[in-house]
């Protein structure tokens, strides 16, 4: 069983509509869609936006469906200036950009008693990288950071880049999903696409290009599933 998590309806609808033998159940107000995609058993959920929603949905998915792996799909704001709208983002590490326990000796972004970063499954990273090469998509592997704020100003962007110079993108759920997977020992990877450049025009860009990002990330996830 492959678990696929997206925060927004636009981020999961494309994949959901491709399921055969579709079945829907609801647990704690979270909807799960099970079916067959590319001859693989999958379960797709729309988690809702933000870290708490993401952690709840991931926990429910793992407990109910016992997935072998989890893929987080959707959109993200680019922090790397070489990225453009529609480019595919593949996580190697994910971190929180809004966690601060440095007073107790932890690194900025680190949750106490948790790793500094949550590492994606290396075999999954390799599989996704092969897929994007086959599809001739522009993609980047790197650090994705998460927090409970939409990054829509130059000031917000600069603050994150100062704290995490190597971060390529920012969004609102991936690290919570990753932490949950870490605690349940479930391999994961984040496969998102750029919807905006996390700057003063981010809100306009996000609304205009969310669909493009959703198509790009969904196509990549579908191709990945076919290879698993």
Curated annotation (Swiss-Prot):
InterPro entries xref list: MTA_SAH_Nsdase, Nucleoside_phosphorylase_d, Nucleoside_phosphorylase_sf
Annotated binding of substrate, by residue: 77, 151, 172-173
One GO cellular component, as annotated: cytosol
One GO process term, biological-process aspect: nucleoside catabolic process
Reactions the enzyme catalyzes: S-adenosyl-L-homocysteine + H2O = S-(5-deoxy-D-ribos-5-yl)-L-homocysteine + adenine; S-methyl-5'-thioadenosine + H2O = 5-(methylsulfanyl)-D-ribose + adenine; 5'-deoxyadenosine + H2O = 5-deoxy-D-ribose + adenine
Pathway the protein takes part in: Amino-acid biosynthesis; L-methionine biosynthesis via salvage pathway; S-methyl-5-thio-alpha-D-ribose 1-phosphate from S-methyl-5'-thioadenosine (hydrolase route): step 1/2
GO molecular function: adenosylhomocysteine nucleosidase activity; methylthioadenosine nucleosidase activity
Function: Catalyzes the irreversible cleavage of the glycosidic bond in both 5'-methylthioadenosine (MTA) and S-adenosylhomocysteine (SAH/AdoHcy) to adenine and the corresponding thioribose, 5'-methylthioribose and S-ribosylhomocysteine, respectively. Also cleaves 5'-deoxyadenosine, a toxic by-product of radical S-adenosylmethionine (SAM) enzymes, into 5-deoxyribose and adenine.
Annotated family: Belongs to the PNP/UDP phosphorylase family. MtnN subfamily.
Record's protein name: 5'-methylthioadenosine/S-adenosylhomocysteine nucleosidase
């Amino acid at each position: 069983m492959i678990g696929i998590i997206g925060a927004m309806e636009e981020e999961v609808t494309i994949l959901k509509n491709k399921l055969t033998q579709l079945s829907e159940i609801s647990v704690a107000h979270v909807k799960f869609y099970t079916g067959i995609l590319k001859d693989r058993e999958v379960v797709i959920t729309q988690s809702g936006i933000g870290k708490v929603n993401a952690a709840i949905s991931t926990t429910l998915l793992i407990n109910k469906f016992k997935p072998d792996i989890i893929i987080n799909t959707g959109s993200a704001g680019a922090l790397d200036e070489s990225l453009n709208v529609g480019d595919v983002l593949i996580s190697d590490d994910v971190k929180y950009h809004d966690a601060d326990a440095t007073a107790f000796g932890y690194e900025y972004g680190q949750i106490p008693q948790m790793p500094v970063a949550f590492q994606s499954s290396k075999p999954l990273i390799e599989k996704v990288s092969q897929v994007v090469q086959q599809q001739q998509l522009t993609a980047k592997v790197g650090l994705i950071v998460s927090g409970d704020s939409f990054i829509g100003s130059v000031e917000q962007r600069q603050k994150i880049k100062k704290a995490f110079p190597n971060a390529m993108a920012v969004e609102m759920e991936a690290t919570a999903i990753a932490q949950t997977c870490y605690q349940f020992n479930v391999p994961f990877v984040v496969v998102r696409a750029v919807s905006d450049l996390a700057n003063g025009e981010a809100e306009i860009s996000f609304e205009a290009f969310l669909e493009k990002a959703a198509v790009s990330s969904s196509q990549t996830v579908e191709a990945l599933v076919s290879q698993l």
